[in-house]
C-alpha cells in the first residue's frame, strides 16, 4: 500500500492517520495519533481451521513503557504479562468489532494495538478502537463497518468529546461510545450517580461524534480506493434445515412453553429432542438419503441448525406472545433472595445474593493503605487503587468440569465493571482510610452474574461496616429484534443472553447510574432503542434495591473484631526520615514494640494499623512524641542514656535527647554526676533552653510537683 497521511480536525484536536508506513507485511495497519499519543494497530487474516463453527478473533492491546520514556522494573527490565488496564482495553477494542464481522466468517483474525508513544493528556484506548476499524478495512476483511469510538466526559453541565485524563478525573462521567453506520454497537461508562436522561443525552452526543469519524474513514477508503468487503455467506443446506425443522419444531415449542422448568431441566429436554428426533432419526436413514449425505458431509451442521431453530422459536415466542421461556413478562425480574454475615466474622463482611438460578457470594476485606494496588509500572496516570473488586467464575457454577486457570479476560472485565459501579459510593479516603477488597465468587450462573456481584458487593460492604453513601444495585437488559419488531427484556437469564441480540448492564443507586456496559450481537442500535433500554432498567434496579434493603438497610456501626483498627496522623514531611530511621531501623522498632503496621505517605500522612486499638494508640504516641515540637518550660519524664564529666544526657522523647549540666542536677553543689543519676534512670526534667542549633538544655530544678505528676501521666493526644 502507498503511504497515506491524513489529519482530521476533530472537536478542537487533530487525529492523524498514517497508513502504509509501518508493518508492511500485516494485512492492514494504521498509526493513529492525537497529541503525543500514538497507537499502531494491525489486522491480519489467515485461513481458518477446518470444522470450526465460530469466529477465531483475537484482539490484543500492548503497552510498552518506552512510550512514556520509562524503563520497566524488575530484574529483567522488560514488560511482563499485560497489566489489568491493558486487558480491559483489549476487551474494549474487541467488543464493538466482533458483532460487525459476518456471522459466517471462520478465518483466523488477529488484531494487535501497540501504544508507541503516550502523553499525559490523551488516553490511547478510543484511538485503538477506531484504529482497529481502519486496519480491518485496509486488510480487506469482511466487515460491516466502518466503526469508530469516542469518549464523552461531563464537567458541570457540559459534555466533552475525548476529555483529557485530568478532565476525566474531575468530571462526573467517563463514557465510551462505539458505533457503526447502523447505530450504537458498544457503550462502557462509569458515572457519579447521573440521571438516566443525562446518560441518554451523553450517548447521543457521543454517537454524533462517532458519525464524523465514520465519515472520515470513508474518505480515507475513497482516497486509497479501498472497498468495504462484505462477502457472501455460505449456502444453507435447505434439505437438512427442513428435516430438522419438521422433526423438532413442535417438540421445541412445547419445551419453551413449560415455564416451570429450570435451566438444567430445559437444557436436558432440548438435548433429548436433538438426540431422539434428529440424531437417531438421521442414523436410521438409508446411506443414500440426501439428509444423511448432508449430515455426513457437514458433521457440525446438525448442531448449528438445531441451535438456530431453537433460537428462532424462542425469539418468535417473545416477539409474538410477549412471554419468556420461564413465563415472565418482558419487564419482570426473577425472584430475589439475599443474606449477610453468612460466614464467621474473621471474614470482615459477607453476603449471598441470588436472582433465579444465579447465585453470587461476595466477601469484603479491609486492609491498610499499604495494601493498595501499586500501578507504578502502568502507562496510565493512576498511581494506586484503594478499592479492588475481583470476580471468580469456577466451572461448577455452570455444572461443568474444567481445569482451573488464572482469571481470564471475562473475569477481569466483570470485576472491573462491578468495581466501577461501586467506586462512586465509597467514603472518602480521609474519612475511611482502609483499602477495600471485595471478591465475588459465582456459585451458580444463569445470566447477569456481573450485576449479581454488584448487588452482593453492596451488601458485603455494609456487612463489613464500610460507610457507603448509598447502596448500589444492577440489572442486565436484553433485546430481541426481528426487523422492525423490538422487545426489550429485563433481567435476562442465560438462554436469553445466548440467543438474544444485546447484553446491556446498568448499575446505580436510587439517585442515578454509576456504571453501564452494553454489548451487541447485531450491527447497531438506534438511540431510541438504547434510551428505552436504559429507562426500562430503572424500575428493575429500584425493585432489586428494595429487596436488598430488606436484608440490610444501613452499614453496620462496628467493624469485624478481626478487621485492623486504623489511626491516622499528620507529621511534617521533613520528619519522615526521622520516623523511618537509617535503613528503616526506627520504624521497624516501633512496629515490633507495638505489634502494629505503619504506612507513611509522601505528604506526611501516617496510617497505623493494629488488630487492637490500644496497640495502634501506643504506636501513635511514640510517633507523636518523636515528631512533636519541644518548647522551653515543658516538663517530661526521660531516661538517662549516657553520662559525661559535666553532666548527663537524657532522652526526653524518642530520638530527642538533651543534656542536664551537673549544676542543674540537684540543689546545691554536686561532686560527681554519678552521685545523682545512673544510665537507665528515669528522671523528671524541664526544658530550660533550646539554643540556636536546636540543642536541648535540661534541668531538674524548679519543677512543681503537679508538673512532675502530669509528666508521668502524659500521653499523646488522640
UniProtKB/Swiss-Prot annotation:
GO terms for molecular function: 3'-5'-RNA exonuclease activity; magnesium ion binding; polyribonucleotide nucleotidyltransferase activity; RNA binding. GO terms for cellular component: cytosol. Residues 564-623 form the KH domain. Its EC number is 2.7.7.8. Its cofactor is Mg(2+). Keywords: Cytoplasm, Magnesium, Metal-binding, Nucleotidyltransferase, RNA-binding, Transferase. Residues 633-701 form the S1 motif domain. Pfam families: KH_1, PNPase, RNase_PH, RNase_PH_C, S1. It is an enzyme of class 2 (transferase). Mg(2+) binds at residues 497, 503. PROSITE patterns: KH_TYPE_1, S1. One of its GO terms (biological process) is RNA processing. It is found in: Cytoplasm. InterPro entries: ExoRNase_PH_dom1, ExoRNase_PH_dom2, ExoRNase_PH_dom2_sf, KH_dom, KH_dom_type_1, KH_dom_type_1_sf, NA-bd_OB-fold, PNPase. NCBIfam families: polynuc_phos, PRK11824.1. Involved in mRNA degradation. Catalyzes the phosphorolysis of single-stranded polyribonucleotides processively in the 3'- to 5'-direction. Belongs to the polyribonucleotide nucleotidyltransferase family. This is Polyribonucleotide nucleotidyltransferase. It comes from Rippkaea orientalis (strain PCC 8801 / RF-1) (Cyanothece sp. (strain PCC 8801)). The gene is pnp.
Amino acid at each position: 500500500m502507498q503511504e497515506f497521511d491524513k489529519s482530521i480536525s476533530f472537536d478542537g484536536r487533530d487525529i492523524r492517520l498514517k497508513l502504509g508506513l509501518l508493518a508492511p507485511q500485516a494485512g492492514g495497519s494504521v498509526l493513529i495519533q492525537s497529541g503525543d499519543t500514538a497507537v499502531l494497530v494491525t489486522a491480519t487474516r489467515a485461513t481458518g481451521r477446518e470444522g470450526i463453527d465460530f469466529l477465531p478473533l483475537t484482539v490484543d492491546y500492548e503497552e510498552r513503557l518506552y512510550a512514556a520514556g520509562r524503563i520497566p522494573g524488575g530484574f529483567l527490565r522488560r514488560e511482563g504479562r499485560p497489566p489489568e488496564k491493558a486487558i480491559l482495553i483489549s476487551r474494549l477494542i474487541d467488543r464493538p468489532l466482533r458483532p460487525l464481522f459476518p456471522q459466517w466468517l471462520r478465518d483466523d483474525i488477529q488484531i494487535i494495538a501497540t501504544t508507541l508513544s503516550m502523553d499525559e493528556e490523551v488516553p490511547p484506548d478510543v484511538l485503538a478502537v477506531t484504529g482497529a476499524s481502519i486496519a480491518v478495512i485496509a486488510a480487506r476483511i469482511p466487515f460491516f463497518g466502518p466503526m469508530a469510538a469516542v469518549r464523552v466526559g461531563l464537567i458541570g453541565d457540559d459534555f466533552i468529546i475525548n476529555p483529557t485524563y485530568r478532565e476525566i478525573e474531575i468530571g462526573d462521567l467517563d463514557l465510551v461510545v462505539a458505533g457503526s453506520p447502523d447505530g450504537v454497537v458498544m457503550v462502557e461508562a462509569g458515572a457519579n450517580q447521573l440521571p438516566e436522561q443525562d446518560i441518554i443525552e451523553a450517548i447521543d452526543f457521543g454517537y454524533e461524534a462517532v458519525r464524523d469519524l465514520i465519515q472520515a474513514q470513508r474518505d480515507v477508503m475513497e482516497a486509497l480506493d479501498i472497498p468495504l468487503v462484505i462477502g457472501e455467506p455460505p449456502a444453507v443446506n435447505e434439505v437438512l434445515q427442513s428435516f430438522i425443522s419438521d422433526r423438532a419444531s413442535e417438540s421445541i415449542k412445547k419445551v419453551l412453553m413449560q415455564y416451570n422448568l429450570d435451566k438444567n431441566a430445559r437444557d436436558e429436554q432440548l438435548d433429548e429432542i436433538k438426540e431422539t428426533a434428529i440424531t437417531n432419526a438421521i442414523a436410521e436413514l438409508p446411506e443414500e438419503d440426501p439428509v444423511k449425505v448432508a449430515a455426513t458431509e457437514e458433521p457440525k451442521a446438525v448442531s448449528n441448525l438445531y441451535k438456530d431453530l431453537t433460537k428462532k422459536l424462542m425469539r418468535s415466542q417473545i416477539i409474538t406472545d410477549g412471554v419468556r421461556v420461564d413465563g415472565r413478562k418482558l419487564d419482570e425480574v426473577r425472584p430475589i433472595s439475599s443474606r449477610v454475615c453468612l460466614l464467621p466474622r474473621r471474614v470482615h463482611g459477607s453476603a449471598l445474593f441470588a436472582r433465579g438460578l444465579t447465585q453470587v457470594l461476595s466477601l469484603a476485606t479491609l486492609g491498610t493503605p499499604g495494601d493498595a494496588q501499586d500501578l507504578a509500572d502502568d502507562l496510565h496516570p493512576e498511581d494506586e487503587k484503594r478499592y479492588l473488586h475481583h470476580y471468580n467464575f469456577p466451572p461448577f457454577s455452570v455444572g461443568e468440569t474444567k481445569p482451573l486457570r488464572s482469571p481470564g479476560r471475562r473475569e477481569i472485565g466483570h470485576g472491573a465493571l462491578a468495581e466501577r459501579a461501586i467506586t462512586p459510593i465509597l467514603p472518602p479516603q480521609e474519612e475511611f482510610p482502609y483499602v477495600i477488597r471485595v471478591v465475588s465468587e459465582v456459585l451458580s450462573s444463569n445470566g447477569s452474574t456481573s450485576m449479581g456481584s454488584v448487588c452482593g458487593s453492596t451488601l458485603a460492604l455494609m456487612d463489613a461496616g464500610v460507610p457507603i453513601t448509598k447502596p448500589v444495585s444492577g440489572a442486565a437488559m436484553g433485546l430481541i429484534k426481528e426487523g422492525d419488531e423490538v422487545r426489550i427484556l429485563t433481567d435476562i437469564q442465560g438462554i436469553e443472553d445466548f440467543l438474544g441480540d444485546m447484553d446491556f448492564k446498568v448499575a446505580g443507586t436510587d439517585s442515578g447510574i454509576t456504571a453501564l456496559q452494553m454489548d451487541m450481537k447485531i450491527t447497531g442500535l438506534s438511540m431510541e432503542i438504547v434510551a428505552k433500554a436504559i429507562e426500562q432498567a430503572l424500575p428493575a434496579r429500584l425493585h432489586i434495591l428494595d429487596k436488598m434493603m430488606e436484608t440490610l438497610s444501613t452499614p453496620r456501626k462496628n467493624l469485624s473484631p478481626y478487621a485492623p483498627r486504623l489511626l491516622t496522623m499528620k507529621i511534617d514531611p521533613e520528619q519522615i526520615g526521622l520516623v523511618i530511621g537509617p535503613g528503616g531501623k526506627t520504624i521497624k522498632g516501633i512496629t515490633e514494640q507495638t505489634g502494629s503496621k505503619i504506612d507513611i505517605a509522601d505528604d506526611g500522612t501516617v496510617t497505623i494499623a493494629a488488630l487492637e486499638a490500644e496497640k495502634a494508640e501506643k504506636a501513635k504516641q511514640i510517633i507523636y512524641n518523636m515528631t512533636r515540637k519541644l518548647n522551653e518550660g515543658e516538663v517530661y519524664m526521660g531516661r538517662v542514656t549516657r553520662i559525661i564529666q559535666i553532666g548527663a544526657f537524657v532522652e526526653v522523647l524518642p530520638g530527642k535527647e538533651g543534656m542536664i549540666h551537673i549544676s542543674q542536677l540537684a540543689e546545691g553543689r554536686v561532686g560527681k554526676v554519678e552521685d545523682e543519676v545512673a544510665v537507665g534512670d528515669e528522671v523528671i526534667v524541664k526544658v530550660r533552653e533550646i539554643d540556636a542549633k536546636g540543642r536541648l538544655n535540661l534541668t531538674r530544678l524548679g519543677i512543681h510537683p503537679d508538673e512532675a505528676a502530669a509528666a508521668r501521666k502524659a500521653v499523646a493526644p488522640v
